[in-house]
Regions:
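OB-fold and OB-like single-stranded nucleic-acid-recognition modules
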Residues: 1-105
């Protein structure tokens, strides 16, 4: 996801709150988690560092969220809420991470 305001610092819950519209649902797009492998000395290892999945909200482009542990993904297009979602801007790109997610009925 691209963002047009330059900020400094690392991950922030307030930046995530600015980007999402709390009145609109967030839908899960991924069927499976994508493992993010660890790299050492520029070489890929067999160790999984994190897991990523794709989501969408009306008015925003699809976005990827990183989880440090394996989470249970709900069915395609299920409405979800994140546990401790944070965002980080790097060179006008925004990256997200969360502790967990849950399906909202």
């Amino acid at each position: 996801m691209k963002f047009n305001n330059k900020r400094s610092g690392g991950y922030s819950a307030s930046l995530a709150a600015q980007l999402f519209d709390s009145s609109k649902p967030i839908h899960s797009l991924s069927l499976d988690l994508e493992p993010q492998m660890k790299f050492e000395d520029g070489k890929r290892t067999d160790e999984v560092q994190a897991y990523k999945a794709w989501f969408t909200q009306a008015g925003l482009p699809p976005f990827e969220v990183k989880f440090e542990t394996k989470v249970a993904l709900p069915a395609y297009l299920s409405v979800v809420e994140f546990d401790n979602i944070e965002a980080c801007e790097v060179s006008y790109n925004v990256y997200f991470r969360a502790v967990d997610l849950k399906e909202v009925n």
